[in-house]
Amino acid sequence: MGTVHARSLDPLPMNGPDFGSPDDADLVEVEPEKKQEILENKDVVVQRVHFEGLGRTKDDLIAHEIGQVFKAKNLIEVMRKSHEAREKLLRLGVFRNVEVLIDTSEGEDAVPNGLDVTFEVTELRRLTGSYNTMVGNNEGSMVLGLKFPNLFGRAEKMTFQFSYGTKETSYGLSFFKPQVGNFERNFSVNLYKVTGQFPWSSLRETDRGVSAEINFPIWKTSHTLKWEGVWRELGCLARTASFAIREESGHTLKSSLSHTMVIDSRNASILPKRGALLKINQELAGYTGGDVSFLKEDFELQLNKQLAWDSVLSTSLWGGMLVPVGDRPSSIADRFYLGGPTSVRGFSMYSIGPQSEGDYLGGEAYWAGGVHLYTPLPFRPGRGGFGDLFRTHFFLNAGNLCNLNYGEGPRAHLQRLAECIRWSYGAGLVLRLGNIARLELNYCIPMGVQSGDRICDGVQFGAGIRFL
């Protein structure tokens, strides 16, 4: 997207006593390797940094992103730190393009080893629009958006987004504000309305809400603190909905505080080859208002190890628990769901666990684990190109979803979670869609099927971002 250009501090003369005449130039041996070494190790000073193309972007925002350039001591460091500064500027989301030019200093105050660095930038327009498609957990959607980037000159942005999907329709307005000099620290506010259809539960849900969140890093972890207030309207999706679903119909008001911690050392979010992910989330509802009260904990763990022949062994573990607070039972909208091509394969979407007349009610506790082996395609067709997006996939999944009696002790809870384990195994193909999503086509053999579970024995297709 951009290039770092640099001029030599000491250009090689083309004639003169140091080089010879043009006639005998072919008798002189030039050693570019030594010249390059001298150039790399020569001490330099960055005297000035110029910006061309700035409009509404504030100077203090820019100054924090390019400060390290002045600390460079040689040409290689100048080029490296200039490239890092360019990446930081692009990450702000206020420039369409950033180019870097490194040149020798000129002017009366120029020193012999002085350098000037120039960033040529192109700012985004005040209003931009977008149209794209997105892939969620076994759901596709069309997304229309309007964005006001760099609203006040310090990388703020306001976004309006409308999404129409196969199971969900939503629109929302959000405002994003990063901390100057520390983009990972940011604040955002969201207003939204989401209408979703959940055929596995014969349920329709409409959420109208507002949320505010703060994101910040601590050492190698990233944290999110969030408050959310949402008015939820639940209704029956079909006239044949069970009585248990009809009992859940109506309006509830949830006000909750949540905290999420993430440690991610993976080399990629989609089909990583190495690294680990740990994500822990806690949510407490009811103490800041509303008529829904609960404590909810869940986690996600993933480990990836690269093996011989470009194969990858991946293991993952999910788990969670929902504890109602007070006399009111938990809502179907807050419980966990399990099953489908993105979790325990070989079972239909969210069709494991408690159910009533064919409508799945979710559970207050669950766990799920998986072991996966990803290998290149046999005989490596399309190696180095399109073929590298495909992987063969061998998997073993297991999990359970249930309700707990919180009057019992932890031993009884663990025993309940260890009963009636559903598991499956199989093989298939995986297609990586950039670093955005992945598609799976697997042949699944479900095992440990319990009464009421809905299975998908044979070929199963899955699309999404988060997979077990």
Curated annotation (Swiss-Prot):
<dbReference type="GO" id="GO:0033108">
    <property type="term" value="P:mitochondrial respiratory chain complex assembly"/>
</dbReference>
<dbReference type="InterPro" id="IPR039910">
    <property type="entry name" value="D15-like"/>
</dbReference>
<dbReference type="GO" id="GO:0005741">
    <property type="term" value="C:mitochondrial outer membrane"/>
</dbReference>
<comment type="function">
    <text>May play a role in the maintenance of the structure of mitochondrial cristae.</text>
</comment>
<keyword id="KW-1000">Mitochondrion outer membrane</keyword>
<protein>
    <recommendedName>
        <fullName>Sorting and assembly machinery component 50 homolog B</fullName>
    </recommendedName>
</protein>
<dbReference type="GO" id="GO:0045040">
    <property type="term" value="P:protein insertion into mitochondrial outer membrane"/>
</dbReference>
<keyword id="KW-0472">Membrane</keyword>
<keyword id="KW-0496">Mitochondrion</keyword>
<dbReference type="GO" id="GO:0042407">
    <property type="term" value="P:cristae formation"/>
</dbReference>
<feature type="domain" description="POTRA">
    <location>
        <begin position="44"/>
        <end position="124"/>
    </location>
</feature>
<dbReference type="Pfam" id="PF01103">
    <property type="entry name" value="Omp85"/>
</dbReference>
<dbReference type="InterPro" id="IPR000184">
    <property type="entry name" value="Bac_surfAg_D15"/>
</dbReference>
<dbReference type="InterPro" id="IPR034746">
    <property type="entry name" value="POTRA"/>
</dbReference>
<comment type="similarity">
    <text>Belongs to the SAM50/omp85 family.</text>
</comment>
<keyword id="KW-0812">Transmembrane</keyword>
<keyword id="KW-1134">Transmembrane beta strand</keyword>
<comment type="subunit">
    <text>Associates with the mitochondrial contact site and cristae organizing system (MICOS) complex (also known as MINOS or MitOS complex).</text>
</comment>
<feature type="region of interest" description="Disordered">
    <location>
        <begin position="1"/>
        <end position="25"/>
    </location>
</feature>
